Amino acid sequence: MTKTTWLTYNDLAWTDSLITSPEECKEETEYFVRTIRDHSRIEVQTLLHLGCGAGMNDYTFKRHFKVTGVDMSAGMLEIARTLNPEVTYVCHDMRTVTLEQRFDAVAIPDSIGYMITERDLRNTITTAREHLKPGGVLLIVALVREDFQENNFVYTGSREEVEVTIFENNYVFDSHQTTYEATLVYLIRRKGELEIFTDRHTLGLFPLGTWFSLLADAGLEVKQITMEHAYDRFISHEGEYPLRVFTGVFRKTRFLGQTNQQC
């Protein structure tokens, strides 16, 4: 996992703002806000968003919290900083980032899938826990193995003379593996001229038992909710894409240092 692995988050990062918008993410993000507040044992004023991407969720998060976002894609952070100048953004790997500040809440709503080994997942959960104040809550949104379907998705968008269509195929090679493959095909037309790009992503797919075990091992009091229909509008055929929302309240304290880098 490196900063230059995927076109989606580097050379093609600009397509994200054509495919979706902060307004389209508002309803989903408001749901995350309510869930965070409902489960936290303390008043939530500060939020650490790990794997923040282009900042679409932050556009709504910042209306409720003082937000700090972390992502390892410089291309995505460039978009995020333009969209959300009020938000502090840090270029770093969410498995290892260490900030001087603790937060009332930590959210990972859209990027935990890139943890493809149990070790990576454990490290990310530990990093999140270490940035929580006692009584604060961690929110993670994940696709779990029990819910996986080999879906196909279609995303479209345009701006002026640029049209973008993205086809995504999800596939599991081995039912016993803890990963699946998401292959994306980009059709980009500029003034009618077509360019085609492909991008293959390996994503994590862990059973519920692993999630509960790792979250509990981190000292979190865990609850889980099923979130359905969030991606229904993008599925190209009959299918379902339920996601699990995990919340974990942290009661312990821990010293934090600082080792960061900026994009």
Model-derived segments and spans:
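Conserved class I S-adenosyl-L-methionine
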Residues: 1-43
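A short acidic, Gly/Pro-enriched loop at the edge of an enzyme's catalytic core
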Residues: 96-106
